[in-house]
A protein has these predicted regions:
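Jelly-roll (double-stranded beta-helix
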Residues: 1-257
Length: 257
């Protein structure tokens, strides 16, 4: 298993609404400076912040499956399907853009914080489907706790969110002195963003490597293996993991660096 750790300097950045919304982008759009341009069907990952409030006006989407996952504050959504919704901390909004939809969004703080993540299904097939939108509150997501680790399943498995693209997503909190182990099978990639605190990651039997808050970790597996994440210090660790296939059996959108 191969491990790569990318600090914020190797991630992209962006802003909206005159700087009211700022973004750190582990996987950005073309030209936004991220060292990682895509990971299989994981096309885009932005970590947005708004100290007070920020607005992004109506704009179109097609084909992609777009998840908004709220860390803090509130996310407002409106679209051309006639939908209006608000989601708070721990909640999520999912757009499956299909043949096309327009939407607008607002982040409301103080200190609003969320992820927007794009997954790429087979675009040709997706364009034949009607667009859909769904919202989920924090209490709808299952959590399991064991030996100082809390794992919330956001996409896949027991979660209410299932998408067409092959992907799983988890929000993991690790107490000081505890560790979380994630198994990876061949042709699988794990993308990890350290949301709160730092820690150590070891891939299989390799020596553990340290990472800091806001670092982006990428692990690729060519055979069965496991990655271990341990908290460092006295404040614990929170990170979000997304697992996708390293390669898919359909053509992907040609994304430039």
């Amino acid at each position: 298993m191969k491990l790569r750790i990318l600090p914020p300097a190797e991630q992209g950045s962006g802003e909206f609404d005159g700087g009211a919304i700022t973004e750190q982008k582990p996987i950005g759009f073309s030209g936004e400076g991220s060292a990682i341009h895509r990971l299989g069907p994981l096309f885009y990952w932005a970590w947005a912040h708004a100290e007070a409030e920020g607005f992004i006006g109506s704009h179109p989407h097609q084909a992609f499956e777009i998840l908004t996952y709220v860390i803090h504050g509130q996310a407002y959504h409106g679209d051309s399907l006639g939908t209006e919704s608000i989601v708070g901390p721990g909640g999520a909004q999912l757009i499956q853009a299909g043949s096309g939809v327009y939407h607008q969004e607002r982040l409301v703080g103080p200190d609003a914080e969320l992820f927007q993540i794009w997954f790429e299904p087979n675009i040709r097939d997706a364009l034949r489907r009607d667009p859909q939108y769904a919202a989920y509150e924090a209490h709808e997501f299952p959590e399991r706790e064991q030996e100082g680790v809390t794992v919330k399943t956001v996409i896949g498995g027991p979660s209410p969110i299932h998408i067409v693209a092959d992907a799983g997503m988890w929000d993991v909190s690790v107490s000081p002195g505890a560790s979380y182990v994630h198994a990876l099978h061949p042709n699988r990639t794990l993308a990890v963003l350290a949301v709160r605190g730092g820690g150590e990651c070891s891939a299989d039997d390799a020596e553990a490597q340290s990472f800091a808050e806001k670092d982006f970790l990428v692990l690729r597996s060519e055979e069965d293996g496991q990655a271990r994440f341990a908290a460092r210090g006295t404040n614990g660790l929170r990170f979000v993991l997304i697992e996708v296939p390293t390669e898919v059996d359909y053509p992907l959108y040609p994304k430039k660096p």
